[in-house]
From Swiss-Prot:
It holds the Pfam family Ribosomal_S2. The gene is rpsB. It comes from the Bacteria. This is Small ribosomal subunit protein uS2. Residues 226-255 are annotated as: Disordered. It comes from Staphylococcus aureus (strain NCTC 8325 / PS 47).
Length: 255
């Protein structure tokens, strides 16, 4: 059974593409028809592609991998943040800083600065520093949290990227491709699907559509995590059973 229904997709307006004059011919195979100068996306293909993306992210999560959610356009910012947090993943929803993946060593120094400023406040340094300096530190902290707060706990490269609108996030995609990080993306009729490993043909401009699909990808990750925890429990139970059997064998021998 598909993880998403045609009814859900229709209600969220996932089928509305861009105007026919603003399209990428490579998206032709995902287009059902044209209506009033707007392309209509083939939702049967979207259902299938959502399944593929879901299963991929579920497997990444089962294997203990982390996913970076990227969506800096207004329609995606809230969904990307809330769904990444719900699944315990990382996100960028303001601006992609150049080198975020390819020059992570430098970016990680800026992330470290967040903790440094927090420690200064905890240690009471804000009480003794000049007021002007404290104001500047708070401004710096707010700026760092705004742009890097979503990846402050990211200690290594993500195993996958989930992107809303590849045209908008071309820098993120270029860096991920350079590092061979697989990309799942919500791809509208004006985008190049060749840049994306797991294409989800869909409206990337409607908040409801973006929310629905982003939530499904978060669900996939959560389901994968459930698989990991179930395996861990099963492994622990097997260890306990082995130890119990050994204990019973020892007692029988002693008797």
């Amino acid at each position: 059974m598909a993880v998403i229904s045609m009814k859900q997709l229709l209600e969220a307006g996932v089928h509305f593409g861009h105007q026919t004059r603003r399209w990428n011919p490579k998206m032709k195979k995902y287009i059902f028809t044209e209506r009033n100068g707007i392309y209509i996306i083939d939702l049967q293909k979207t259902v299938k592609k959502v399944d593929e993306a879901y299963n991929f992210l579920k497997q990444v999560s089962e294997d203990g991998g982390q996913v970076l959610f990227v969506g800096t356009k207004k329609q995606a910012q809230e969904s990307v943040k809330s769904e990444a947090e719900r699944a315990g993943q990382f996100y960028i929803n303001q601006r992609w800083l150049g080198g975020l993946l390819t020059n992570y060593k430098t970016i990680s120094k800026r992330i470290k600065r967040i903790s440094e400023i927090e420690k200064m406040e905890e240690d009471g340094l804000f009480e003794v520093l000049p007021k002007k300096e404290v104001v500047e530190l708070k401004k710096e902290y707010d700026r760092l949290i705004k742009f890097l707060g979503g990846i402050r706990d990211m200690k290594s490269m993500p195993q996958a990227l989930f992107v809303v609108d590849p045209r908008k996030e071309r820098n993120a995609i270029a860096e991920a491709r350079k590092l061979n990080i697989p990309i799942v993306g919500i791809v509208d009729t004006n985008c190049d699907p060749d840049e994306i490993d797991y294409v989800i043909p869909a409206n990337d401009d409607a908040i409801r559509a973006v929310k629905l699909l982003t939530a499904k990808m978060a669900d996939a990750i959560l389901e994968g995590q459930q698989g990991v925890s179930n395996e861990e429990v099963a492994a622990e139970q097997n260890i306990d059973l082995d130890e119990k059997e050994k204990s019973e064998e020892t007692e029988a021998t002693e008797e």
